[in-house]
């Protein structure tokens, strides 16, 4: 059986990777919002524009919430191993 330290280190490595993913997701969301802001007024305020903005926000929020939960869960597990 592997020592708890091995599992702890693997979980911490996973945390770093997940936090990097979270940062990348935030950057992508910012880029997409910037592109949305640069749409013409006609497109931005059309049904297409409203639906696009809502879809972008919903997708970002769903991924962000799941990543936050996963990070919290793994952090809790790592701290439980560390004792």
Predicted regions and their residues:
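Long, low-complexity or tandemly repetitive, helically biased scaffold regions used
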Residues: 1-83
């Amino acid at each position: 059986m592997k020592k708890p330290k091995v599992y702890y280190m693997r979980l911490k490595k996973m945390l770093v990777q997940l936090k990097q993913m979270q940062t990348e997701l935030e950057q992508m969301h910012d880029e997409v919002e910037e592109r949305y802001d640069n749409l013409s007024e006609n497109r931005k305020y059309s049904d297409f524009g409203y639906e696009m903005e809502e879809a972008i926000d919903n997708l970002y929020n769903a991924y962000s919430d799941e990543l936050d939960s996963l990070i919290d869960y793994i952090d809790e597990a790592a701290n439980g191993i560390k004792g």
